[in-house]
Amino acid sequence: MEEQTFISKKVGVLPARWGSVRFPGKPLAMILGKSLIQRTYENIIQSETLDKVVVATDDQRIMDHVLDFGGACLMTSPECANGTERMAETVSRYFPEAEIMVNIQGDEPCLRHTVVDALVRKLEEHPEIQMVTPVAQTTDSHEILTNQKVKCVFDKNGKALYFSRSPIPHILKKETPIYLHIGVYAFRRSALFSYIASAPSPLSQAEDLEQLRVLEHGGSIHVCVVEAKSPSVDYPEDISKVEEYLTCHSSASF
């Protein structure tokens, strides 16, 4: 039987796997009555720029759950090493005409669709840019010092110079701005498959940050500075932080 394909040009993909070492079954973790993946999906389908939003998984439990709440879900190989590889397989198999694709982490239940729209518009308005990702300024000392939050420095043209789990730049003056990286990436098709074809690189392995692989191979990543900064779910204990955030922002659409 021939596999279904879609004609969408701009696609949002939410990679979701069951076997997280830090939090097994994380996509189905409940947050105030809805699963993590459902909250993320329902935020992103409000996008004004994407033609299609899908969850990409290798687990039948996740697929069944997404279909149950009315979402779109596609099955991928369990061999994918990370979310970007899962998105690349999804695009290659199901979206042969996609020109812009956005990798949206399924652990961002409070991520607003406006962040995704800003990335897509950046690519639409600047044909020379191949890949773009959001950053948000922070003054929170815990966020700056913890290795669970990734920091980014970039040049005056908005091109990323480096990403690190360490505080960068080193702060000699209080007014030095620090930017947190938000784990969402918008690619042009050629940039996505160029990344997939590249070999793992020393700094990406040292920091455990796949985006450094792009920089080490001579590619470029532009940043889009956004106001929206919200908690993600990496560990089970993060659920209570997200619930508190949602309760405090109950007037917003989540």
UniProtKB/Swiss-Prot annotation:
EC number: 2.7.7.38
Reactions performed catalytically: 3-deoxy-alpha-D-manno-oct-2-ulosonate + CTP = CMP-3-deoxy-beta-D-manno-octulosonate + diphosphate
GO MF term set: 3-deoxy-manno-octulosonate cytidylyltransferase activity
Keyword Transit peptide included in the entry's annotation: no
Pathway assignment: Nucleotide-sugar biosynthesis; CMP-3-deoxy-D-manno-octulosonate biosynthesis; CMP-3-deoxy-D-manno-octulosonate from 3-deoxy-D-manno-octulosonate and CTP: step 1/1; Bacterial outer membrane biogenesis; lipopolysaccharide biosynthesis
Enzyme class, spelled out: transferase
Source organism, top-level taxon: Bacteria
InterPro entries recorded: Cytidylyl_trans, KdsB, Nucleotide-diphossugar_trans
GO terms of biological process kind: CMP-keto-3-deoxy-D-manno-octulosonic acid biosynthetic process; lipopolysaccharide biosynthetic process
Record keyword Nuclease present: no
Localization per record: Cytoplasm
UniProt keyword terms in alphabetical order: Cytoplasm, Lipopolysaccharide biosynthesis, Nucleotidyltransferase, Transferase
A GO cellular component annotation in the UniProt record: cytosol
Pfam families linked to this entry: CTP_transf_3
Recorded family membership: Belongs to the KdsB family.
Primary role: Activates KDO (a required 8-carbon sugar) for incorporation into bacterial lipopolysaccharide in Gram-negative bacteria.
Protein name as annotated: 3-deoxy-manno-octulosonate cytidylyltransferase
Native source organism of the sequence: Chlamydia abortus (strain DSM 27085 / S26/3) (Chlamydophila abortus)
Name of the gene: kdsB
